Design a protein with these regions (language model features):
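Selective transmembrane helix interface/packing segments
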Residues: 1-155
Length: 155
């Protein structure tokens, strides 16, 4: 495997970790959860210096968004270098922003699926991961849960 491609994969994984941190902040997941506590203790020192000029606005951590876009940009650069493709700065930044939205939508979709399956399999579980998925999807599902019962369908 090409080392540049492997570095691209690692920067994408870091971007995913920062995206989870962004969602934890936005949905105000409980700090008592061990997964959230670990992510805050490891990633907050990276975001704190950038909060001087990129504050948290409306629950959105702009410093974390900066890190995600920067990591995606580095990943696109490493990937294009590994495949010997032309690298365009404007296209890489725009694709980084688009991939941020795609990544957040993927995380929300999979957490919705995990929350639905978890409510069927283990409705009274105290699993920290299921708790995170439930807390992320709860604001999204609240309008549908106000509907009347549909005879066994779980919204």
């Amino acid at each position: 495997m090409d080392p540049l491609y492997a570095s691209s994969v690692l920067t994408n994984l870091l971007a995913i970790v920062f995206s989870f941190y962004l969602l934890f902040r936005f949905f105000e997941i409980s700090f008592l959860n061990p997964i959230v506590k670990l992510s805050f203790s490891t990633l907050d020192p990276f975001c704190r210096p950038f909060r001087i000029f990129l504050p948290i606005m409306f629950g959105i951590d702009l410093a974390c968004i900066f890190w995600i876009i920067d990591l995606k940009f580095i990943s696109f650069y490493l990937f294009s270098s590994s495949k010997e493709m032309d690298f365009d700065l404007v296209n890489a930044i725009s694709w980084s922003i688009l991939s941020l939205f795609f990544l957040i939508s993927q995380i929300l979709r999979f957490s919705l699926f995990i929350s639905i399956i978890g409510s069927w399999v283990a409705p009274t579980s105290n699993n920290p991961f299921l708790s995170i998925c439930h807390n992320i999807t709860q604001p999204l599902l609240k309008p549908f849960q106000r509907l009347t019962n549909f005879g066994g369908m779980d919204f």
